[in-house]
């Protein structure tokens, strides 16, 4: 039984690769935005965002992370006329121990993904193919980052609400 593409089942050509510091644990997810806001409320002054600032890796207290703790990581590229290679060598380019790697693909056009935060898991998102935007929210400040090169990853520490959107189409 062959299924033909139609406007109802059209998907984007984007592939989002996710590198995570924790194994899957449903209890680590914060899926309700109101619950997220309650968790991160504190007396800490949240400074204005700067996505280029390297992460301080505040592992233990997700409520202390802000969008300025998110950072772009450039991975090495080995150029070859037969196709480029981007190696990811654990702690050489990743600021945490890798426990899980997965990818999201065949995303329906106009769909948003993510829409959650983590209590303890760090993630790096990579546009392995195509492009998409990531909206970062620390409960006070918001910032949108475009990912469109497979040699760059966006490090998202715990306590940051992330929504992936506007995946590129065919």
Task: Please state what every model-predicted region is.
Residues 8, 12-15, 24-154, 169-170:
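Non-catalytic, conserved peripheral segments adjacent to functional cores
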Residues 3-4, 22-25, 161:
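Short acidic/polar capping segments at secondary-structure boundaries
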Residues 1-3, 150-160:
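Conserved SET/PR-domain catalytic core that frames the SAM/AdoMet-binding pocket
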């Amino acid at each position: 039984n062959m299924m033909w593409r139609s406007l109802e089942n059209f998907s984007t050509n984007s592939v989002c690769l996710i590198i995570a510091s924790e194994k899957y644990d449903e209890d680590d997810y914060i899926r309700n935005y109101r619950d997220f806001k309650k968790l991160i409320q504190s007396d800490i002054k949240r400074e204005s965002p700067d996505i280029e600032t390297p992460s301080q890796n505040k592992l233990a207290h997700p409520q202390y992370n802000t969008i300025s703790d998110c950072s772009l990581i450039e991975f090495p590229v080995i150029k070859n006329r037969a196709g480029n290679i981007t190696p990811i060598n654990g702690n050489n380019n990743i600021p945490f121990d890798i426990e899980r790697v997965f990818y999201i693909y065949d995303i329906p056009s106009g769909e948003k993904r993510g829409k959650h935060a983590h209590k303890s898991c760090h993630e790096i998102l990579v546009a392995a193919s195509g492009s998409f935007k990531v909206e970062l929210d620390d409960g006070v400040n918001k910032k949108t980052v475009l990912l469109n090169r497979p040699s760059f990853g966006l490090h998202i520490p715990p306590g940051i609400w992330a929504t992936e959107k506007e995946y590129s189409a065919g």
